[in-house]
Amino acid sequence: MNLTDLKRKTAADLAVICQDMGLEGTARQKKQEIIFNILNARAQCDAIYGEGVLEILQ
């Protein structure tokens, strides 16, 4: 599960993910806040990996 996949999901899909993860109080939150809560919960129990290009300017 990565950020791009979460952004593509509907609010209903995100609510199901929250329910599966045991997160409560997300029914009245904005989509971005729900995504943050999902990623925050994942960070607490797993590692979060990022990928991309790092440009070093000198």
From Swiss-Prot:
Enzyme Commission code: 3.6.4.-
UniProt keyword annotations, A-Z: ATP-binding, Helicase, Hydrolase, Nucleotide-binding, RNA-binding, Transcription, Transcription regulation, Transcription termination
Protein name according to UniProt: Transcription termination factor Rho
Enzyme's top EC category: hydrolase
Pfam families: Rho_N
Assembly and oligomerization: Homohexamer. The homohexamer assembles into an open ring structure.
One MF annotation (Gene Ontology) recorded for this entry: RNA binding
Free-text function comment from the UniProt entry: Facilitates transcription termination by a mechanism that involves Rho binding to the nascent RNA, activation of Rho's RNA-dependent ATPase activity, and release of the mRNA from the DNA template.
Family of the protein in this entry: Belongs to the Rho family.
Transmembrane segments: none
GO biological process: DNA-templated transcription termination
Cited InterPro entries: Rho-like_N (IPR011112), Rho_N_sf (IPR036269)
Domain of life from the UniProt record: Bacteria
Gene3D superfamilies from the UniProt entry: 1.10.720.10
